[in-house]
């Protein structure tokens, strides 16, 4: 998945000071009982882990469904490549343009989270990619597809690192790994779900005089538009401003966070931070690792439905179902 390509962007927030540690925090255990703590944390988990994971399912689907569209209804003559008259070179360009815009806009999208409150910025990102994803269903040619695919990458680029950055306002460093792991794992399941949805939507080919691939993008883009409204009115921004928390719960969260936790009111990003960041060898080793991971992992994901179909022992519908297996075992 493309969301994870430049996770290092969010690390600039912390590079100007020593890594946060639970030792730097005020331990509120003596002030608050266990039932109170669990209840307060569950409220935050519902939104920052549960809601974001739900959104992430459709974010992954809205980017991975292009590979499913490559073979949907191929036998019926209503395939996307045939209807849009895309040759192999043009198809490759429409596939890769998403990653180019993603690469360009991910750093700036992430930094803008410091200028806008999280709920409002997430609303903009989710709504934008939802509209762009549904707009694919109306594309009539190569140029239109290039434009809309570029726009989808631009909108989706900031989501994954912004989620990690938003979580840092709320959780102790020791609490972050398990929540990030759950959030990321959901993305793998959504890739499997994408194949199942493509299989089902393929049977809608011709309904309302629309090809199956147009229904695919239309139906899979709509949930993001709905979820963007939920994000605007439901997501908690910062502990000190969250409407869902009581005053006592706000105090609890503020007391338990590290001194290096980012603030919702002021930022600590500057050029000194960048110098410290790029002097850290971990940045380069992680970048090399992620580059190798992306070349192998993302390349296979984009081509997998087509590869399965071209093996020659199944229909396009069954190929969509067989695509589920590889993600289910990951």
What would you call each of these model-derived segments?
Residues 47-88, 105, 109, 194-198, ...:
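Extracytoplasmic
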Residues 67, 272-330:
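Extracytoplasmic gate region of multi-pass secondary transporters
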Residues 2, 173-187, 196, 206-276:
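Central mid-sequence intracellular linker of multi-pass
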Residues 62, 85, 116-117, 138-144, ...:
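Helix-breaking motifs and short loop linkers at transmembrane-helix boundaries and internal kinks
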Residues 103-143:
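Conserved MFS/SLC helix-loop-helix module at the cytosolic interface between two early adjacent transmembrane helices
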Residues 148-188, 201:
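Cytoplasmic helix-loop-helix junction between adjacent transmembrane helices
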Residues 93-111, 324-330:
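Central cavity-lining transmembrane alpha-helices of secondary-active solute carriers
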Residues 1-71, 82:
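Cytosolic juxtamembrane N-terminal segment immediately preceding the first transmembrane helix
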